[in-house]
Amino acid sequence: MSSSSSSGAATGFAVCSDPQKSFSKMFKRTVILLAGPTGSGKTAVSLKLAPLVDGEIISVDSMQVYQGMDIGTAKVSLADRKEVPHHLIDVCHVQESFNAVDFYYHAVQACQDILSRNKVPILVGGTGFYFHTFLSGPPSGPSPDFVLREQLTLEAQERGISALYQELELLDPVYAATITKHDKNKIIRALEIIRKTGSKVSSYAWQSTVNESKEYHCRGWLLSPDPELLRHNILERCDQMLEEGLLDEVQALLAAGIKGNSSASRAIGYREWIEFLDLGSPPDLFEITKQKFITNTWRYTKKQRTWFKRYSLFRELRPMGMTLDDMAKKIAQDYFLCG
C-alpha cells in the first residue's frame, strides 16, 4: 500500500475522486497530529489508526526518548513496534540531554524518511511544547550568559527553586505553564533570557528563521475524554505501572545515572519514587508517595488540556461511547475526505 487512495479503497472511506485534487494533496505532504492528555488513549488509538492510513508513528513524548524509561512513560511495547514502525523512542541514554530543538530536527528527519517511502507520518503524544516546536520551528534563543546563570543558580540555593518559579509565573505565565515548578534548569534558563533581553521566552524564543515543517500540511486531532473518565484512567494507569514493576525500573535507572539528567529525574512517575527510594523505601510512605504520583499526573493532564485547546488546528474528538476502532476510523475517514 503506497498511497492514501489505496488505503481509502481498502477501508471503504470516502476518497477524492478528482485526480487533480489527489495529485495536489499528495504534494502537500500531509502529516497527522494526534494529541491528548495522559491517559486519554492516544497510543491505543494510534496503533489502530496507522494501518488504516498506511502510516508510521513519531512519538511526541519528552521522556520516551530515553532508554530504560519504559513503564513510567507507558512506552509502546516491542511487539506493537514490530507491527507499526515507531520513531523517536529510545534515542538516547538517561544521562544525555534531549530538548525541543533536538526533537524538532529528529521529527523533521523522521517525516522526510516516512514520506519518502509514501507512508503517512503520525505524530502522537502529549508534550505540547514539542508539538509547538514542530509547528512553529526550532527556538532561537539568545546565547548563554554564564555569569547570570551562576547568579540565578545561587538564588535558587538561597531562595529555593519554587521562589524562582513564582517569579517566572509573574514575568512569563505562558511559558511557566509549559514546565513544572521542579524543572530547575528550564526555570533558570528562562529567567536568564528574561533578565538578559527583557523579553518573554514565550514571545522571543519562537522567532525562527528556518522551519522545515512548514512544507507539511498538518491535520490534528485532540482526544478529549470526560474528566471523570480521564481520572479513572489515571488511577488505573498508576496502579498498573506499579504492578508492572515501576519501582524496579526506577532502581535500575538510578544505577544508570538518571540523577545526572535533571529533566529525566524530575519526570512525573520517576521523581516521586526516586525520593521514596532515597529515603530507604519506608513502608509507611508508600501510599503517600503513590498519592503524590496520582495527584501530579492529574495536575499535568489539566495543563495538557489547557495547552492543546489553544490551538484551532486540533479538532476535538470526545471518546464518549466510541471504541478505539471507532475513533481510529473517524480520524482516518476525516483524513481521506476531500476538502
Curated annotation (Swiss-Prot):
Origin: domain of life: Bacteria
Gene Ontology biological-process entries: tRNA modification
Gene3D superfamilies, A to Z: 1.10.20.140, P-loop containing nucleotide triphosphate hydrolases (3.40.50.300)
MF annotations from Gene Ontology: ATP binding; tRNA dimethylallyltransferase activity
Binding site for substrate: 38-43
Entry keyword set: ATP-binding, Magnesium, Nucleotide-binding, Transferase, tRNA processing
One Pfam family, short name: IPPT
Sequence positions that bind ATP: 36-43
EC numbers, comma separated: 2.5.1.75
Reaction(s) catalysed (UniProt annotation): adenosine(37) in tRNA + dimethylallyl diphosphate = N(6)-dimethylallyladenosine(37) in tRNA + diphosphate
Interaction with substrate tRNA, annotated site positions: 127, 149
Region spans: Interaction with substrate tRNA: 61-64
InterPro entries: Dimethylallyltransferase, IPT, P-loop_NTPase
Cofactor(s), by name: Mg(2+)
Cross-referenced NCBIfam families: miaA
Chain's role: Catalyzes the transfer of a dimethylallyl group onto the adenine at position 37 in tRNAs that read codons beginning with uridine, leading to the formation of N6-(dimethylallyl)adenosine (i(6)A).
Membership in a protein family: Belongs to the IPP transferase family.
Subunit structure: Monomer.
Protein name per UniProt: tRNA dimethylallyltransferase
